[in-house]
């Protein structure tokens, strides 16, 4: 019996090592996102799962494949309260994917959408799936308030509601402080001034407005239909935040999180609704189907540090991802680092010596918005199209997440 068990174990180990030595190359065949809506704005009446379904359906269409070709759907989402069971399953079936499609919902806070891509890439690399849709979504407008004392009845006195957005999305789980407090701490630690953050924010808005004006987002956005009174259908076709900016008010805004802080409503990301998806497949399978991939995933990594230091976690994840990809910082043409706050972009660029002209060239979350479950995938979608449209070779996407973490991904244009 022991001998037989030993043979089985040896066989499994051998199979594991064989798999590891013959990893499939993973490519992005299509990359799509919705416009990003303001909280309470143009997309606020649409459930987040529906927004995700719209991007999945469009990603499948643009990839030139059939819904039945998708083996697995891995979808990021942060605040799942009141969405119903198995949000990723809802997203997949709502997009017309078949009942056989394996579905998984991922919560790594703001890194959820990117971590979904990583899990999808790993599934393909190991030969478990041939085609995976990965992405993320968030309707911050539809996150409920919690009545946590109602399960067994309030015994006496006034009761309060808990904001689900804050509790499960935007507050540190260990000391209860807002994420912006961590942003202020980061600014103090790296000696980044209010003026520098405001300048970064203004630049983010200007870049986003320029990108909208010139149609630079057109290739990545799928329009979202809104059914109004009398069944009249209108379409949301562009990000809602950039054109709401009032530049003259930015220098005079009060600190948002700490009395003497430097993070303000203008140099922080906003509360938003949106979704994004990519179609992943093995490079060999794409070739079999006669498809032309947009990019190859050549490296990825995660990193963690103290929760209060989450804004600079990308500075740990990026070098690890580059090492795994076998390239160095000087070879990277473009960086997309999610702008949870302007200080995140500034601090990570300072630590890693990133040229501002290579960073978030079409603006970032400060200007575009930050639907937290989607943003990790959204910046990969944007980066994929940037590399194509600018005919550049290597790009890095990275995003920090509450709790002290980060995920980073390295792309090579094809």
From Swiss-Prot:
PROSITE patterns: THIOLASE_1, THIOLASE_2
Residues where K(+) binds: 205, 266, 268, 366
A biological-process GO annotation: ergosterol biosynthetic process
Active site: 110, 370, 400
Keywords: Acyltransferase, Metal-binding, Potassium, Transferase
EC number(s) recorded for this UniProt protein: 2.3.1.9
Superkingdom to which the source organism belongs: Eukaryota
Gene Ontology MF: a single term: metal ion binding
A GO cellular-component term linked to this record: cytosol
Protein family membership: Belongs to the thiolase-like superfamily. Thiolase family.
Record protein name field: Probable acetyl-CoA acetyltransferase
Annotated organism of origin: Dictyostelium discoideum (Social amoeba)
